[in-house]
A protein has these predicted regions:
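PEST-like low-complexity, intrinsically disordered acidic/proline/serine-rich tracts
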Residues: 1-242
C-alpha cells in the first residue's frame, strides 16, 4: 500500500488530471471507425509483416541499450495517436484548432505537440526529408479542410506502414459543436489498397492544459537503471566464478 503523501509512479487521473467522466463524447450506433473499402483494415502485405517482425526482433535484442532504444512515447517524443491520422488515445485526447492567414495549427494535448499546416498552395518538402508527423499541406474544398501528408519517417509507423505512408485528412464542421474527421491512408508497402475511417469530434469548453511528460518520466529512468543493475549483478557473478 502507498503511504500517506506518496505519489503513484505512473499517470493517475485522480492526481494529475480530470477524470474520464468529464470527457465530451460524440455518440453513435456505429461499431467501427473504418468505412472503406470493405469496412475493415486490409491485412498487411508480406513486406510489411517482415518489416514488423524485424522491428520487434531488434527491439527485443536492444530494448535496454539506452534511451535511444526505448519507444518514442516513453521518451516523450511522440505518441502513435498524434498521427496523422489522429486517433484519440485513452487520455489527453483534446485538440485545439487555430486558423490564420496561410496556415492552420492543430495543438494536441498529448505531449503538447503542434501540427502547423500551410494552406498557401506551397509544395511538399523534398522527398529525402522525413519527419515524425510527416509534411502536411492543406487546401479548402468548400467548407472542408483537406490535408495531404507525406514524407514520414519509419520510426512513426502507423499500423505497419513505412516511409511511403500517404495520409489524406478531411475536416468538416457539421454543427456548431461538432467536426467530422475523415482520413484515408495509403502505403503500397503495407496494404494492397488504401483504406478510410471517420469519427466525429465533439466541442469541449476547454481549456487544454499543458501536458508534462519528462517532468515525471520515472518509467524510462527506472527501466534503464534496472537493466544496468542487472548487468552489473551478472558481471559480478561471472567474475566470482573465475
Amino acid at each position: 500500500m502507498k503511504e500517506t503523501g506518496d505519489l503513484a509512479v505512473h499517470y493517475d487521473t485522480s492526481q494529475f488530471g480530470l477524470d474520464r467522466s468529464h470527457a465530451t463524447v460524440a455518440t453513435s450506433n456505429r461499431t467501427s471507425l473504418v468505412v472503406g473499402p470493405e469496412g475493415r483494415v486490409p491485412p498487411l502485405l508480406p513486406e510489411a509483416q517482415k518489416r514488423q517482425a524485424e522491428r520487434a526482433a531488434y527491439q527485443r535484442e536492444h530494448q535496454w541499450d539506452g534511451p535511444e532504444s526505448r519507444p518514442l512515447a516513453e521518451r516523450c517524443i511522440t505518441w502513435p495517436s498524434e498521427g496523422p491520422p489522429m486517433l484519440a488515445p485513452g487520455y489527453n485526447s483534446n485538440l485545439q484548432i487555430v486558423q490564420g492567414k496561410g496556415y492552420v495549427a492543430i495543438m494536441q494535448e498529448m505531449i503538447h505537440d503542434v501540427r502547423i499546416i500551410p494552406t498557401d498552395n506551397s509544395a511538399h518538402l523534398p522527398s529525402n526529408i522525413h519527419l515524425y508527423f510527416g509534411d502536411s499541406r492543406g487546401h479548402w474544398e468548400g467548407n472542408t479542410l483537406v490535408v495531404d501528408t507525406t514524407n514520414f519517417t519509419d520510426k512513426t509507423a502507423f499500423r505497419g506502414s513505412g516511409e511511403k505512408l500517404h495520409v489524406v485528412e478531411k475536416f468538416t464542421r457539421t454543427a456548431d459543436d461538432a467536426i467530422k474527421y475523415e482520413f484515408t491512408v495509403d502505403d503500397a508497402t503495407a496494404w494492397a489498397k488504401p483504406w478510410s475511417a471517420e469519427v466525429t469530434w465533439a466541442k469541449e469548453a476547454g481549456p487544454v492544459f499543458e501536458y508534462a511528460c519528462q517532468e515525471g518520466n520515472y518509467g524510462m529512468k527506472n527501466n534503464l537503471s534496472g537493466a544496468r543493475a542487472t548487468e552489473k549483478k551478472a558481471a559480478e557473478a561471472a567474475a566470482a566464478k573465475k
